Regions:
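Catalytic/regulatory signature loops of cyclic-dinucleotide turnover enzymes
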Residues: 79-80, 94, 116-141
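Cytosolic regulatory/linker segments at or just downstream of nucleotide-handling modules
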Residues: 98, 127-188
């Protein structure tokens, strides 16, 4: 997750206000993640990385990740109705194998995930429009085998996208929330 329009806002505000706004949003968003069984891996400036299916196994991790993403987007849209400083989120989700564990040195060690799966999720987030959720075809395939409520969520094919640093493109889908939008086609 990354806040799409945070840098221009941060340029206009005092540092204390920037920290307060970020911390307020992080408190709200990370509670959604933890309630869904996600692991908050790290906060990086105006974004954060979440793991599902590690460190705790979850058979429906793709559904949990998408439901969390939808809940976070809903929360941001709702918060923007009453807050002076409006933010947008960009969320990229990809599923696959990753190197997961304690990585670092004796001075600084972090439990984290690294590898192509992590990089692909980040690259998906980078091509998102504000308030958009993009998922890879790998995540989409897992969702089709899990219990995601098709009455509230649809997946819109976005075609094959070339992501920075990858030798070949990947099929991408946007996640549309029928609670926020009426312009969508149900998931098949």
């Amino acid at each position: 997750l990354d806040f799409a329009n945070f840098t221009p806002l941060a340029e206009q505000l005092a540092p204390d206000d920037v920290v307060r706004i970020l911390n307020d949003y992080y408190a709200l968003l990370t509670s959604i993640v933890t309630e869904a069984g996600g692991y908050l891996d790290k906060i990086m400036g105006d974004g954060f990385m979440v793991l599902y299916n590690a460190p705790v196994f979850s058979i429906d991790h793709a559904t949990r990740a998408v439901q969390s993403a939808i809940a976070m987007r809903r929360l941001i849209v709702e918060a923007n109705r009453t807050r002076a400083h409006k933010l947008s989120v960009r969320i990229g989700l990809h599923s696959g194998e990753a190197v997961v564990g304690n990585i670092g040195t004796s001075i600084l060690m972090n439990y984290t995930a690294i590898g192509d799966t992590v990089n692909t999720a980040k690259r998906l987030e980078e091509i998102c429009e504000p308030d958009q959720i993009l998922i890879s075809s790998d995540t989409y395939a897992l969702l089709k085998g899990e219990e995601l409520d098709p009455r509230n969520v649809v997946m819109q094919p976005q075609g094959r996208k070339q992501l920075k640093g990858r030798s070949s493109g990947i099929e991408v889908f946007s996640v549309e929330d029928l609670m926020l939008s009426v312009h969508a086609t149900p998931m098949h």
